[in-house]
Protein backbone atom coordinates (compact mmCIF):
# COMPACT_ATOMS: atom_id res chain seq x y z
CA UNK A 1 0.00 0.00 0.00
CA UNK A 2 1.30 3.46 -0.89
CA UNK A 3 2.15 5.73 2.03
CA UNK A 4 -0.28 8.66 2.22
CA UNK A 5 0.81 11.73 4.15
CA UNK A 6 1.49 15.41 3.53
CA UNK A 7 5.08 14.72 2.47
CA UNK A 8 3.92 12.45 -0.35
CA UNK A 9 1.15 14.88 -1.33
CA UNK A 10 3.74 17.66 -1.64
CA UNK A 11 6.01 15.43 -3.72
CA UNK A 12 3.15 14.47 -6.05
CA UNK A 13 1.99 18.06 -6.37
CA UNK A 14 5.44 19.30 -7.35
CA UNK A 15 6.04 16.46 -9.79
CA UNK A 16 2.63 16.99 -11.40
CA UNK A 17 3.37 20.70 -11.81
CA UNK A 18 6.73 20.14 -13.47
CA UNK A 19 5.35 17.52 -15.86
CA UNK A 20 2.43 19.81 -16.73
CA UNK A 21 4.82 22.67 -17.53
CA UNK A 22 6.91 20.36 -19.69
CA UNK A 23 3.80 19.10 -21.49
CA UNK A 24 2.77 22.70 -22.19
CA UNK A 25 6.24 23.50 -23.50
CA UNK A 26 6.76 26.10 -20.75
CA UNK A 27 9.02 24.30 -18.28
CA UNK A 28 12.03 26.58 -18.79
CA UNK A 29 9.94 29.76 -19.00
CA UNK A 30 7.79 29.21 -15.90
CA UNK A 31 9.67 26.91 -13.52
CA UNK A 32 11.27 29.81 -11.61
CA UNK A 33 7.79 30.92 -10.52
CA UNK A 34 6.84 27.54 -9.05
CA UNK A 35 8.24 28.19 -5.51
CA UNK A 36 6.39 31.52 -5.38
CA UNK A 37 3.21 30.00 -6.78
CA UNK A 38 3.28 27.19 -4.21
CA UNK A 39 4.14 29.52 -1.30
CA UNK A 40 2.64 32.93 -2.14
CA UNK A 41 3.02 35.97 0.08
CA UNK A 42 1.18 35.73 3.43
CA UNK A 43 0.58 31.99 3.00
CA UNK A 44 0.82 29.70 6.02
CA UNK A 45 4.18 27.97 6.39
CA UNK A 46 4.16 24.42 7.74
CA UNK A 47 7.26 23.18 9.56
CA UNK A 48 9.60 25.97 8.37
CA UNK A 49 10.80 29.20 9.95
CA UNK A 50 9.51 31.52 7.23
CA UNK A 51 8.10 31.73 3.72
CA UNK A 52 11.56 32.35 2.24
CA UNK A 53 12.84 29.08 3.69
CA UNK A 54 9.79 27.30 2.30
CA UNK A 55 10.41 28.72 -1.16
CA UNK A 56 14.05 27.61 -1.00
CA UNK A 57 12.87 24.11 -0.10
CA UNK A 58 10.51 24.10 -3.10
CA UNK A 59 13.44 25.05 -5.32
CA UNK A 60 15.76 22.36 -4.01
CA UNK A 61 13.04 19.70 -4.08
CA UNK A 62 12.63 20.47 -7.77
CA UNK A 63 16.25 19.56 -8.51
CA UNK A 64 15.99 15.77 -8.00
CA UNK A 65 12.75 15.76 -9.97
CA UNK A 66 14.77 17.26 -12.82
CA UNK A 67 17.43 14.57 -12.40
CA UNK A 68 19.95 16.46 -10.23
CA UNK A 69 21.22 16.13 -6.67
CA UNK A 70 22.67 18.76 -4.34
CA UNK A 71 26.24 18.20 -5.51
CA UNK A 72 25.27 19.58 -8.92
CA UNK A 73 24.75 23.06 -7.49
CA UNK A 74 27.93 25.03 -8.15
CA UNK A 75 26.32 28.45 -7.62
CA UNK A 76 23.38 29.10 -5.29
CA UNK A 77 22.20 31.91 -7.59
CA UNK A 78 21.64 29.52 -10.49
CA UNK A 79 17.90 29.68 -11.31
CA UNK A 80 15.71 26.63 -11.79
CA UNK A 81 15.30 27.55 -15.44
CA UNK A 82 19.00 26.80 -16.04
CA UNK A 83 18.60 23.39 -14.43
CA UNK A 84 15.49 22.76 -16.53
CA UNK A 85 17.43 23.51 -19.71
CA UNK A 86 20.12 21.07 -18.65
CA UNK A 87 17.52 18.42 -17.82
CA UNK A 88 15.94 18.70 -21.26
CA UNK A 89 19.35 18.41 -22.96
CA UNK A 90 20.71 15.65 -20.69
CA UNK A 91 22.30 12.69 -22.43
CA UNK A 92 23.56 10.77 -19.37
CA UNK A 93 21.72 10.04 -16.14
CA UNK A 94 23.30 10.13 -12.67
CA UNK A 95 24.66 6.99 -11.07
CA UNK A 96 23.13 7.58 -7.63
CA UNK A 97 19.39 7.22 -7.14
CA UNK A 98 18.71 8.83 -3.73
CA UNK A 99 19.76 12.20 -2.33
CA UNK A 100 19.21 14.36 0.76
CA UNK A 101 17.82 17.88 0.34
CA UNK A 102 19.95 19.67 2.93
CA UNK A 103 17.67 22.73 3.00
CA UNK A 104 14.72 20.51 3.91
CA UNK A 105 16.56 18.36 6.48
CA UNK A 106 15.66 19.48 10.00
CA UNK A 107 18.75 17.70 11.40
CA UNK A 108 16.48 15.99 13.97
CA UNK A 109 18.41 15.19 17.18
CA UNK A 110 22.15 14.86 17.68
CA UNK A 111 21.75 12.30 20.45
CA UNK A 112 18.99 9.72 20.75
CA UNK A 113 18.23 9.96 24.46
CA UNK A 114 16.73 12.60 26.73
CA UNK A 115 15.41 12.82 30.29
CA UNK A 116 11.75 13.78 30.65
CA UNK A 117 9.96 15.49 33.54
CA UNK A 118 9.08 12.03 34.85
CA UNK A 119 12.50 12.07 36.53
CA UNK A 120 11.98 11.93 40.31
CA UNK A 121 15.47 13.06 41.20
CA UNK A 122 15.98 9.84 43.12
CA UNK A 123 18.83 9.10 45.49
CA UNK A 124 20.08 6.03 43.63
CA UNK A 125 20.95 7.92 40.44
CA UNK A 126 21.39 4.69 38.53
CA UNK A 127 21.52 6.65 35.28
CA UNK A 128 24.57 8.60 36.44
CA UNK A 129 26.46 5.45 37.39
CA UNK A 130 25.50 3.70 34.15
CA UNK A 131 26.79 6.49 31.90
CA UNK A 132 30.33 5.76 30.65
CA UNK A 133 30.95 9.41 29.67
CA UNK A 134 29.62 11.32 32.68
CA UNK A 135 26.95 12.99 30.53
CA UNK A 136 24.23 12.94 33.22
CA UNK A 137 23.90 16.19 35.16
CA UNK A 138 21.46 17.20 37.89
CA UNK A 139 19.55 20.39 38.66
CA UNK A 140 20.74 21.67 42.07
CA UNK A 141 17.21 22.78 43.04
CA UNK A 142 14.97 19.97 41.78
CA UNK A 143 17.56 17.16 41.60
CA UNK A 144 16.09 16.22 38.22
CA UNK A 145 18.56 14.84 35.74
CA UNK A 146 19.45 16.12 32.30
CA UNK A 147 21.74 14.85 29.57
CA UNK A 148 24.67 16.88 28.31
CA UNK A 149 24.24 16.26 24.59
CA UNK A 150 27.74 17.48 23.81
CA UNK A 151 29.12 14.50 25.72
CA UNK A 152 26.42 11.84 25.22
CA UNK A 153 27.32 9.01 22.83
CA UNK A 154 23.78 7.57 22.62
CA UNK A 155 24.80 4.22 24.10
CA UNK A 156 21.43 3.83 25.87
CA UNK A 157 22.81 2.58 29.19
CA UNK A 158 21.02 5.32 31.15
CA UNK A 159 17.79 4.41 29.35
CA UNK A 160 18.09 0.83 30.55
CA UNK A 161 19.10 1.82 34.09
CA UNK A 162 16.31 4.28 35.01
CA UNK A 163 13.76 2.57 37.31
CA UNK A 164 11.08 5.16 36.45
CA UNK A 165 11.49 4.92 32.66
CA UNK A 166 12.01 8.68 32.72
CA UNK A 167 14.58 8.51 29.93
CA UNK A 168 13.19 8.26 26.41
CA UNK A 169 14.68 7.09 23.14
CA UNK A 170 14.23 9.63 20.33
CA UNK A 171 14.65 8.05 16.90
CA UNK A 172 15.96 9.70 13.75
CA UNK A 173 13.38 8.33 11.30
CA UNK A 174 15.57 8.01 8.20
CA UNK A 175 18.43 6.39 10.14
CA UNK A 176 16.00 4.01 11.83
CA UNK A 177 14.44 3.01 8.52
CA UNK A 178 17.70 2.26 6.70
CA UNK A 179 18.38 -1.51 6.82
CA UNK A 180 22.09 -1.17 6.02
CA UNK A 181 23.14 1.87 8.09
CA UNK A 182 23.85 4.00 5.03
CA UNK A 183 22.57 7.28 6.53
CA UNK A 184 24.43 9.39 9.08
CA UNK A 185 24.91 13.04 10.05
CA UNK A 186 27.80 15.21 8.97
CA UNK A 187 29.53 17.76 11.21
CA UNK A 188 26.64 20.18 10.64
CA UNK A 189 23.99 17.69 11.69
CA UNK A 190 22.65 17.19 8.16
CA UNK A 191 22.01 13.64 6.98
CA UNK A 192 24.09 12.15 4.18
CA UNK A 193 23.74 8.89 2.26
CA UNK A 194 26.78 6.64 1.90
CA UNK A 195 26.50 5.50 -1.71
CA UNK A 196 28.85 2.58 -1.07
CA UNK A 197 26.30 1.10 1.36
CA UNK A 198 22.96 2.30 -0.04
CA UNK A 199 20.80 -0.40 -1.67
CA UNK A 200 18.22 2.12 -2.96
CA UNK A 201 15.30 0.51 -1.15
CA UNK A 202 13.62 3.91 -0.60
CA UNK A 203 12.70 3.28 3.04
CA UNK A 204 14.45 6.46 4.18
CA UNK A 205 12.45 8.51 1.66
CA UNK A 206 9.17 7.18 3.04
CA UNK A 207 10.31 7.61 6.64
CA UNK A 208 11.48 11.25 6.62
CA UNK A 209 8.72 13.46 8.13
CA UNK A 210 10.14 16.57 6.42
CA UNK A 211 10.40 15.05 2.95
CA UNK A 212 14.12 15.79 2.83
CA UNK A 213 15.07 12.61 0.97
CA UNK A 214 14.22 12.35 -2.70
CA UNK A 215 14.63 9.89 -5.50
CA UNK A 216 16.58 11.39 -8.40
CA UNK A 217 13.90 11.15 -11.04
CA UNK A 218 14.42 10.40 -14.71
CA UNK A 219 10.76 11.00 -15.48
CA UNK A 220 11.32 13.70 -18.10
CA UNK A 221 13.86 11.55 -19.90
CA UNK A 222 11.47 8.61 -19.70
CA UNK A 223 8.59 10.61 -21.16
CA UNK A 224 10.75 11.84 -24.02
CA UNK A 225 11.97 8.32 -24.74
CA UNK A 226 8.41 6.99 -24.74
CA UNK A 227 7.10 9.73 -27.02
CA UNK A 228 9.95 9.36 -29.50
CA UNK A 229 9.65 5.56 -29.57
CA UNK A 230 5.90 5.50 -30.24
CA UNK A 231 5.24 5.28 -33.99
Task: Cite the ranges covered by each PLM segment.
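Ferredoxin-type iron-sulfur electron-transfer modules and their immediate structural context
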Residues: 1-161, 165-177, 181
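Iron-sulfur-cluster electron-transfer modules
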Residues: 165, 170-171, 175-176, 180-231
Amino acid sequence: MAIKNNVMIVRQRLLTKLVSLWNEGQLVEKIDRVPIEFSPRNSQVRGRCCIHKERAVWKYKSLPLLGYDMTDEADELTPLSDYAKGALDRKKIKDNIMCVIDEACSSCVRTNYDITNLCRGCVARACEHACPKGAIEFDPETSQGKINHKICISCGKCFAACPYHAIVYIPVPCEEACPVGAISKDEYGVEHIDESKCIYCGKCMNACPFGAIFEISQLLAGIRLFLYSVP
